[in-house]
Amino acid sequence: YDGTNCKPGVCWEPKPGY
């Protein structure tokens, strides 16, 4: 994803290697 990644119930900023 671009910007922030979101899963059911949690969101976080994309980290290198993910």
Curated annotation (Swiss-Prot):
Its main location: periplasm. GO terms for molecular function: alcohol dehydrogenase (cytochrome c(L)) activity; alcohol dehydrogenase (NAD+) activity. It is found in: Periplasm. Disulfide bonds join C6-C11. Its EC number is 1.1.2.7. GO terms for biological process: methanol oxidation. Catalyzes the oxidation of primary alcohols including methanol. Belongs to the methanol dehydrogenase subunit 2 family. This is Methanol dehydrogenase [cytochrome c] subunit 2.
